[in-house]
Amino acid sequence: MNINTSPDQIIRSSAQVTPGYMSGFGNSFETEALPGALPIGRNSPQRCAYGLYAEQLSGSPFTAPRGTNERSWLYRIRPSVKHSGRFEKADAGLWRSAPCHEYDLPIAQMRWDPTPVPKEEVTFVQGVQTMTTAGDVNTQAGMAAHVYLITKSMVDQHFYNADGELMFVLQQGNLRLVTEFGRIDAEPGEIVVIPRGVKFRVEIPNGPARGYLCENYGGAFTLPERGPIGANCLANARDFLTPVANYEDKDTPTELFVKWGGSLFKTTLPHSPIDVVAWHGNYAPYKYDLRTFSPVGAIGFDHPDPSIFTVLTSPSETAGTANIDFVIFPERWMVADNTFRPPWYHMNIMSEFMGLIYGVYDAKPQGFVPGGMSLHNCMLPHGPDRDAFEHASNGELKPVKLTGTMAFMFETRYPQRVTAHAANASTLQDDYADCWKGLEKRFDPNRP
């Protein structure tokens, strides 16, 4: 190339045009569904190929530091101003946003059985049920923990969330998320993250689906620092998958739902908004298989802090204090010598919302089942139940592999307030605290 060569004259192989995914976390990706749809050497040419419109989607302020600056350039059939109309308020159902003070419940440790999947037809937008909220959606701080129940695919319906990014934690049933950036297929054991402002619809290819949904009002999820662990283990960047471009050119009416300022709005469009033919950038949806997480732990003695199981973190303005940590408890070996191996008894400045995707959780072998949930708020004590304590205190300390298990936690610096729905749910275990009743006084000053 000489100094007179324009970027459009550069010969190169086209960006990825085959169906599938691109590997990596936070990469600057590029992909096109039609050869040559992606401009070379510039973002906003005078005329885009194929008559497309160039549009930037910013996930951070323009002046954010390079390491946290997120944006993507989309080359679409219509600009997003054509994916808008006269909005009207829509029924949000059981979807709530922080601050939510609709129920004043005495402080307590709480646990719920799985929420039954309804028999009636329910789409994703209709099927979100909020369990807890924390922080304030209007200050972009905090989170909400939801359950989603889906028995019907969204057909000629789309949605985007202006209040935060969404993390789907699949528990039962597969999902297909058709997004502006491409298509994501996921199964239980995987998570999908949809950034703030990205349009999508949810389909269920194999029947009803249930799972957990974290709505992150704060900074985008990112990989945690590994510190002395080094360059490997935990969630490795190469295992995150971002979809390749895949567009629709459909001139059929569709409803667009938007969550904004804690409320739900809707409008009708004459066409599908899934019309991005090519894109490049680092602000995009992705999925991750939790079974590829490489855990680290104690190989001598003692039980390390659960932060070593952090998959993703949403940082706050205070170093080391997360807006949200997404933590999992996967299959792993327990080998510590002369050690109480389950999670220890604990009072925590952070607030913990837990769920179980499959298997048995070692600290609660009874009562905490797949699809269930628990809440241990700021400075409320929690820990193993009596059976877990007795087994761990008296069992033979040989190496044990915990298999077929996957629990998770949404941990936040903000107290989590339960919604009226969660407080009055028939699945709430009124006797949850009884799991610790059998813990007897064992103190004997005459027996060291």
Swiss-Prot record:
The keyword Oxidoreductase applies. Fe cation binds at residues 346, 352, 382. It is an enzyme of class 1 (oxidoreductase). One of its GO terms (molecular function) is iron ion binding. Its cofactor is Fe cation. Keywords: Dioxygenase, Iron, Metal-binding, Oxidoreductase, Phenylalanine catabolism, Tyrosine catabolism. Pathway: Amino-acid degradation; L-phenylalanine degradation; acetoacetate and fumarate from L-phenylalanine: step 4/6. GO terms for biological process: L-phenylalanine catabolic process; tyrosine catabolic process. The active site is at residue 303. Involved in the catabolism of homogentisate (2,5-dihydroxyphenylacetate or 2,5-OH-PhAc), a central intermediate in the degradation of phenylalanine and tyrosine. Catalyzes the oxidative ring cleavage of the aromatic ring of homogentisate to yield maleylacetoacetate. This is Homogentisate 1,2-dioxygenase. The lineage of its organism: Bacteria, Pseudomonadati, Pseudomonadota, Alphaproteobacteria, Hyphomicrobiales. The gene is hmgA.
